[in-house]
C-alpha cells in the first residue's frame, strides 16, 4: 500500500545541503541532492510504518499539501510517497 505525505524542502546555503522535513510524522532527513532527500524520506516513512506496526502505534493521517504549504510559506513543499508492505 502506498502512503503519501507532504514534505518541506529547505536548502542550507552554508552547508550546501538539502533538508527534508515531514511535519506529520516529525521525520527529518538531508542530502546533497533532492534525489538523495527523496530516497532518504521514502526509507524513513517505510521504517516509521514498520515500527508503528510492530509497536501497535497509531500513525497520523497526512495533512493536505495546501495545509503544509500555507504553514511553511516561502519553502518548497512536495508530496513524498512510500510503498508500505
Regions found by a protein language model. Name each.
Residues 9-23:
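Short aromatic-glycine-(Arg/Gly/Cys) micro-motifs in beta-strand/loop hairpins
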Residues 5, 18, 27-29:
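Structural detector for hydrophobic anchor residues on beta-strands
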Residues 25-36:
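A short, exposed loop/beta-hairpin motif centered on an aromatic-Gly-Thr core
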Residues 8-9, 32:
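A ubiquitous short alpha-helical element
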Residues 1-6, 39-85:
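Short, charged, surface-exposed hinge/linker loops at domain edges
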Amino acid at each position: 500500500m502506498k502512503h503519501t505525505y507532504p514534505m518541506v524542502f529547505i536548502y542550507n546555503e552554508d552547508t550546501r545541503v538539502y533538508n527534508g522535513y515531514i511535519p506529520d510524522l516529525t521525520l527529518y532527513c538531508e542530502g546533497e541532492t533532492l534525489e538523495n532527500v527523496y530516497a532518504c524520506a521514502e526509507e524513513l516513512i517505510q521504517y516509521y510504518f514498520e515500527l508503528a506496526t510492530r509497536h501497535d502505534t497509531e500513525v497520523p493521517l497526512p495533512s493536505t499539501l495546501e495545509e503544509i504549504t500555507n504553514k511553511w510559506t516561502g519553502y518548497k513543499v512536495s508530496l513524498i510517497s512510500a510503498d508500505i508492505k
